[in-house]
C-alpha cells in the first residue's frame, strides 16, 4: 500500500490522482501500511487539502478514474489534529481461507486455498491464548533500527481472535461452508503479525501443532517458534477505530 521507490502502490496512485484533480502537491497518511496483495476495505487516509476542496467531488472524480481497483468509500473534512495513523486506537482485520479440495475461482483473489481439512474448533481453542496483552515477537517481523537505538516493542493488546464459517454460493448452510474467516482486532499490529498468526493457526487446524502449544509460541518471543507467514491474498484491513469508535464508510449504517 505505502509508496516505495520504483514500484506502483495504492498510496502512490491515489496521491498522484488527487494531485491531478486538485492541482496541488499532497502529503497523505494512512492508518495501515499493508503489504502487497493485502486488501484495504476499511483503510483511512488523511492529508492537508486546499480549503476549497469539495470532498464529494473528489470522491466522484477519484472513483471515476481508478475504479474498480481503487475506490474512495467516504470523504469528509475532519479536525486538524486528526491523523489517520496516530489517532487510531484499534485496527481490525479479516482473513479468509477456502478450505476445500477443489479451488473456487470466485474467491481466488481474496482467500488462501488450503486443501487439507482444517479443525476449526482446534484453531479457535488456540486463538483464545492470543487474546489480551502479550509480547508478540514470535509473530512479528522486527523493523530495522539504527545501531545503538532501542528495539521497538512488540507488545500489543489483542481484543479479538476467532474463526467462523461464512455463507457462500454452493453452500446453503453456513455451518458446512468451505469459506473460513478469521476476525482479529487489536490496539495495533506489527509487521506481518496477522499473517504469521494465521499461518500458525492453520498449522493447528492441520494437526501439526496442539492448541495449547500457542502458549509456548508466545513465550518463546522468537519468530522461528511460529508457523509460516500466510499469503497476503486472504487478508483485508476491515476497519480502524478511533477512541473506541469505528471510523469508516460503514459506521453510518
Please describe what each predicted stretch is:
Residues 1-253:
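Structured-RNA-binding interfaces characteristic of tRNA pseudouridine synthases
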